[in-house]
Amino acid sequence: MSAGQLRRHEIGKVTALTNPLSGHGAAVKAAHGAIARLKHRGVDVVEIVGGDAHDARHLLAAAVAKGTDAVMVTGGDGVVSNALQVLAGTDIPLGIIPAGTGNDHAREFGLPTKNPKAAADIVVDGWTETIDLGRIQDDNGIEKWFGTVAATGFDSLVNDRANRMRWPHGRMRYYIAMLAELSRLRPLPFRLVLDGTEEIVADLTLADFGNTRSYGGGLLICPNADHSDGLLDITMAQSDSRTKLLRLFPTIFKGAHVELDEVSTTRAKTVHVECPGINVYADGDFACPLPAEISAVPAALQVLRPRHG
């Protein structure tokens, strides 16, 4: 089955994983509605709620080993990412009930973000697309899969700072962290090796690697990314000016930043990335410190999505 095409699966049994903390508790309500919809349509449902991400992943792997027609996750991009660690490279489809703050996976595949029952219908209808995933391998050979974007540089420094903060909660924490990092803005010495042949050595503000187009709740950081082309879209920004960087951010909402002089883009299947003291974040979560190898893995996941649109 080639990537990008749809085919139909019979969905009779679903393993449902919920992150009760997603969307400030909205995931629990969304999961109840989605699971009720599945049962109404005659689907058997096995419910999983992990105590933490590691526990949830362990429980999901055990449930998948017993046999299931699909996995349905309710929450944000973090719970989707957790499921990817189990489902990558298998033929078990992933269904998503969006209930987080970002929902970038859901946005990529045209899923309803405010209607859990409609999203559940998409799971039962059984139409899947074969898509690529991103894979990060650190210096110790430990792998992490991702679906959307792997971020390094300024945006990963913002995540580092936000994770250290106890207050405030929600998006305001990230805005404050961003302002704090802007005050410390400095060029970062990156070394990238694309597909083992092309070397880029440059002082960059950020370098992001997209399997899909958006991160951070709709920021089109890699606006031309294609989740079924077997390649990562790479966006690099060079700016030691706070004013220029502040001007850049509004353009990311529409993907227009790629037209700016200080932004360059390219594509590769595999990228070796080095930058001292910088971490990688993927699907919004910490992945590993650099250096790391970031790759596109073709046809690594079956995702349930609307048949049309």
Curated annotation (Swiss-Prot):
Give an example GO cellular component term for this record: plasma membrane
- Cysteine disulfide links: none
Q: Which GO terms describe its molecular function?
A: ATP binding; ATP-dependent diacylglycerol kinase activity; metal ion binding
Specify which residues bind ATP according to the UniProt entry for this protein: N19, P20, L21, S22, G23, G76, D77, G78, V79, V80, S81, N82, T101
The residue ranges of the DAGKc domain are 9-140
Does the record carry tRNA-binding as a key word?
no
Instruction: Write down how the cofactor binds this protein.
Output: Binds 1 Mg(2+) ion per subunit. This ion appears to have a structural role and is required for catalytic activity.
Q: Which SUPFAM superfamilies does its entry note? A: NAD kinase/diacylglycerol kinase-like
Q: Supply the enzyme class, top level.
A: transferase
Record's protein name: Diacylglycerol kinase
Q: What is the lineage of its organism?
A: Bacteria, Bacillati, Actinomycetota, Actinomycetes, Mycobacteriales
Annotated localization: Secreted, Cell wall
